[in-house]
Each structure stands twice: as structure tokens, then as C-alpha cells.
UniProtKB/Swiss-Prot annotation:
PROSITE patterns: AA_TRNA_LIGASE_I (PS00178). A motif ('HIGH' region) lies at residues 11-21. It comes from the Bacteria. InterPro entries: aa-tRNA-synth_I_cd-bd, aa-tRNA-synth_I_codon-bd_sub2, aa-tRNA-synth_I_CS, aa_tRNA-synth_I_cd-bd_sf, Glu-tRNA-ligase_bac/mito, Glu/Gln-tRNA-synth, Glu/Gln-tRNA-synth_Ib_cat-dom, GluQ/Sye. Belongs to the class-I aminoacyl-tRNA synthetase family. Glutamate--tRNA ligase type 1 subfamily. Keywords: Aminoacyl-tRNA synthetase, ATP-binding, Cytoplasm, Ligase, Nucleotide-binding, Protein biosynthesis. This is Glutamate--tRNA ligase. It comes from Streptococcus pneumoniae (strain CGSP14). Monomer. Its main location: cytoplasm. The keyword DNA-binding does not apply. It catalyses: tRNA(Glu) + L-glutamate + ATP = L-glutamyl-tRNA(Glu) + AMP + diphosphate. GO terms for biological process: glutamyl-tRNA aminoacylation.
Length: 486
């Protein structure tokens, strides 16, 4: 590429990182790392209503958990928070006022609301109409004096070129253009409290920080013409823009909503449930981008190497919780036991299950986990009464050979000494039951599995029986025999 790549992720300090925000950060990160560019983080904290105590630290922690690093941020650079840059914004506000490209507006909220109501009643598209329209210089001066005497604090509006055409070649969408007359009239660049509006401040920040490419969600497309107006007014070259498609719920086909209860949408949720960050990183990287081919499991280094902005999708990205869980399970299965056991310890400790057999239980159930917190329901069998059987399990236990199998296997367990009761000796006892009864296959194994574990599927049966213990295994079999004899 001909120019240095500098991209940014600019969140508000709300604390939570939504999956959509995480994707924005991640695509900027991949783009910068692939091209050997700079990835920076800037905090947009001028909207004090959205400010959350400790929100900035939480944002950065969640990004670090995902596996991202950055070159510049408020941690290492001064004035990387918008609240620290108010003097800079004021400098350019004053410049635009002096050049007649912006003006102070004294119209009140009540007057704006009344005008909007009138326009809507007349079937007109709501827009701001310059309050000074048709005034002579004397009338304008008198109007301003009257408003200031009434204590009305002005906003500052950018004077829009209504005949201008604002267009750009989008990295994702292709050519896009807006007419200046269709963006709602002269718009506010500085609020009454002296703070800049988003579309003004972001231009000053991106120019000052030499941002080369702005990669963000397509909900920002409507903001882009306003930002181009500011670039034009200040005589600056705009960066390249790329607007990623919406993320939709794969089940509803609609835009992902915080009300969708069938999905986990915040990075903090994945951290708390014990997903591996590598799995979440991998999944998010494929939301609206793919490297081609059939493979879906990639390391961070592979994703950096493969990332190609030309393969960003023009179609909405489907968020599929089941696919994420499949991917997460693959990562957990292939992770080393020590890593997963360390992640499982807090869950086990809270449940009072951090026993001498805890690590073996984690090893046993690791292949089944989608998230590490599942170690608790998966191991309920070992720490609670025998579970209620499902209809399908009850159906299996009505087989006429079931009592024969269970009585024979119970006798084998009762005959074993404590020293003999080890994992490698359990399977031969099952085979001995087969030899004695002539019953084999699922008619042999399924009744034993259901009687011992209360489940039709699970880890290797000898492992389950050993960890459950000889006495508890015998007790479970006796309980089932009583149940099926009724």
C-alpha cells in the first residue's frame, strides 16, 4: 500500500464490549497487523450520560482477553480521550466561525420541535431551516442581541453546501454518494455545553492522529457525508472508509438485538462462562469475512496472515450461537488439561467440588464442554442423588434382559476389592457379564450406562464408574432395579 496504515477503535467508556464492537476492533486489528500498520485505541467520552465508572479499563481488559494488543492508547499517549481534547476542538470551531463556514445558532429546542411538527404535518421531510434566512445584517444583530439577553446559549452549526455531492469509494460497499441537500440542513457541530458533536470531533481526531482507514459498522454510513463536509470545510484529505455489514441473528434473520435471549452478545459473558478467548476471536473474525476454502478453525497468527479486506462480505453476517459453541468445543477438546483445569477451578470451588478427583473429572468431561462452566452440570452425577430418567432412557430400561445385565454387573462390582477397583479392571468385568449372559452390544452397555450415570451418552463407561466409586455405582444399580421391578 502507498501510505502508512493507521487504524483505530474508538469506543465510549461504557464498560461492556458488545460482539459488534468487538468485531470492529478485531477487523481493525487484523487489518493493521496484516499490513504492518498501526492499531490505536481512542476513547470517545464526551457523552457523559454514557460514561460508566471504570468503563475504560473494562473495555481494554476485554480486548486484551480476546488476544488483541495495540500500539497507541490512553495508557501510553496523552490526549487519547476526547475529554482531553476540548481545546483542539475549540480551535477548529473558532476557525470555521471566523471563515463563515459555521455560525452560532440560537434556536431553542421548543422552536425546533414545533418546526419538526409543522413539517411532518405538511408531509415534508424534517430538516433544520436556517433561522437567519431572509434577515438583513441589522435584523440578524438585533436577533442575536435579543437571544443573548434572554440567556439563550447558542449551539454552533456547520453551513451545509446544499448543492454539494459527497461521495466515496467504500472498501466494502463500493461507490456511495449523498446529496448535500438530503442530510437535514445545517447541523450542530458544537452543543450548548461546549462539547463537540460526534461527527465533528471524530474528524478532528482522525485527522490529528493521521488515521488512514476508517473501518466500522454500516450504521455509520449516514454519518460519513457529514464527516466529509467537515473535511471539506477544513481543507483536509479524508481517510478511506469501509463499512461492515450488519450482524443478524441466524435464527430470526433480523438485526442482532440485545433482547435476543438465545445469544450471548457481550465479551464479558464469554469470559465469565469460561469460553477460550482464542475460540471467540476465531468466531468473530469470520463474522462478515472469510479467507476462502472450507476451513473454519484458525489461530490468531493465521488470521493475521490471511486477512484480506477485499473478502469482507457485502451480505449481513449471521451470528450463530450453535456454531460458536461447536467452535468453542473444538478449542476446549484440543487445549491442554492444565489450562482447562485452571479455568474450571473457580467453578468447582464455588460449587464445593474441588476434590482430589476434580482434575480427573475435568479430563473426563473436557471433550463435551462448550464452555468450562459446564463442568458443574456435567458432574452433577458425582455430587447429587441419582437424576430423573428421560422417557427415552426409561424405554431402554424396560428391555427384558435389563435386570439380568444389571444383577450380573452389580455382583461383579460387589466381588471386587478396593485394590481391584481401578479403571482398567472395570471393562473386563463388563465383558465377563457378556460371556456369562450371552447379552452383548447396546443391550449390554446401555443398561449399565443408564443405571450408573442416568445418561445414554457420555465419557468412557469405565472412567465414569471409577470416578463415581464402587459403593455409589452399586447403589445406583440397586435403585434402578427397584424402579424397574415395580
Amino acid at each position: 500500500m502507498s501510505k502508512d496504515i493507521r487504524v483505530r477503535y474508538a469506543p465510549s467508556p461504557t464498560g461492556v464490549v458488545h460482539i459488534g464492537n468487538a468485531r470492529t476492533a478485531l477487523f481493525n486489528y487484523l487489518y493493521a497487523r496484516h499490513h504492518g500498520g498501526t492499531f490505536l485505541i481512542r476513547i470517545e467520552d464526551t457523552d457523559r450520560k454514557r460514561h460508566v465508572e471504570d468503563g475504560e479499563r473494562s473495555q481494554l481488559e476485554n480486548l486484551r482477553w480476546l488476544g488483541m494488543d495495540w500500539d497507541e492508547s490512553p495508557e501510553s499517549h496523552e490526549n487519547y480521550r476526547q475529554s482531553e481534547r476540548l481545546d483542539l476542538y475549540q480551535k477548529y470551531i473558532d476557525q470555521l466561525l471566523a471563515e463563515g463556514k459555521a455560525y452560532k445558532s440560537y434556536v431553542t429546542e421548543e422552536e425546533l420541535a414545533a418546526e419538526r411538527e409543522r413539517q411532518e404535518a405538511a408531509g415534508e421531510t424534517p430538516r433544520y431551516i436556517n433561522e437567519y434566512l431572509g434577515m438583513s445584517e441589522e435584523e440578524k444583530a438585533a436577533y442575536i442581541a435579543e437571544r443573548e439577553a434572554a440567556g439563550i446559549i447558542p449551539t454552533v452549526r456547520l453551513a451545509v453546501n446544499e448543492s454539494g455531492i459527497y461521495k466515496w469509494h467504500d472498501m466494502v460497499k463500493g461507490d456511495i454518494e449523498f446529496e448535500g441537500g438530503n442530510i437535514g440542513g445545517d447541523w450542530v457541530i458544537q452543543k450548548k455545553d461546549g462539547y463537540p458533536t460526534y461527527n465533528f470531533a471524530v474528524v478532528i481526531d482522525d485527522h490529528d492522529m493521521q488515521i488512514s482507514h476508517v473501518i466500522r459498522g454500516d450504521d455509520h454510513i449516514a454519518n460519513t457525508p457529514k464527516q466529509l463536509m467537515v473535511y471539506e470545510a477544513l481543507g483536509w484529505e479524508a481517510p478511506e472508509f469501509g463499512h461492515m455489514t450488519l450482524i443478524i441473528n441466524s435464527e430470526t434473520g433480523k438485526k442482532l438485538s440485545k433482547r435476543d435471549t438465545n445469544t450471548l452478545q457481550f465479551i464479558e459473558d464469554y469470559r465469565k462462562k469460561g469460553y477460550l478467548p482464542e475460540a471467540v476471536f476465531n468466531f468473530i473474525a469470520l463474522l462478515g469475512w472469510n479467507p476462502g476454502g472450507e476451513d473454519e478453525i484458525f489461530s490468531r497468527e493465521e488470521l493475521i496472515k490471511l486477512f484480506d479486506e477485499n473478502r469482507l462480505s457485502k451480505s449481513p453476517a449471521a451470528f450463530d450461537q450453535k456454531k460458536l459453541d461447536w467452535m468453542s468445543n473444538d478449542y476446549i477438546k484440543n487445549a491442554d488439561l492444565e489450562t482447562i483445569f485452571e479455568m474450571a477451578k473457580p467453578f468447582l470451588e464455588e460449587a464445593g467440588r474441588l476434590t482430589d478427583k476434580a482434575e480427573k473429572l475435568v479430563e473426563l468431561y473436557k471433550p463435551q464442554m462448550k464452555s468450562v462452566d459446564e463442568i458443574i452440570p456435567l458432574t452433577d452425577l458425582f455430587f447429587s442423588d441419582f437424576p430423573e430418567l428421560t422417557e427415552a432412557e426409561r424405554e431402554v430400561m424396560t428391555g427384558e434382559t435389563v435386570p439380568t445385565v444389571l444383577e450380573a454387573f452389580k455382583a461383579k462390582l460387589e466381588a471386587m476389592t478396593d485394590d481391584e477397583f481401578v479403571t482398567e479392571n472395570i471393562f473386563p468385568q463388563i465383558k465377563a457379564v457378556q460371556k456369562e449372559t450371552g447379552i452383548k452390544g447396546k443391550n449390554l452397555f446401555m443398561p449399565i450406562r443408564i443405571a450408573v450415570s442416568g445418561e445414554m451418552h457420555g465419557p468412557e463407561l469405565p472412567d465414569t464408574i471409577f470416578l463415581l466409586g464402587r459403593e455409589k455405582s452399586i447403589q445406583h444399580i440397586e435403585n434402578i432395579l427397584k424402579e424397574i421391578s415395580k
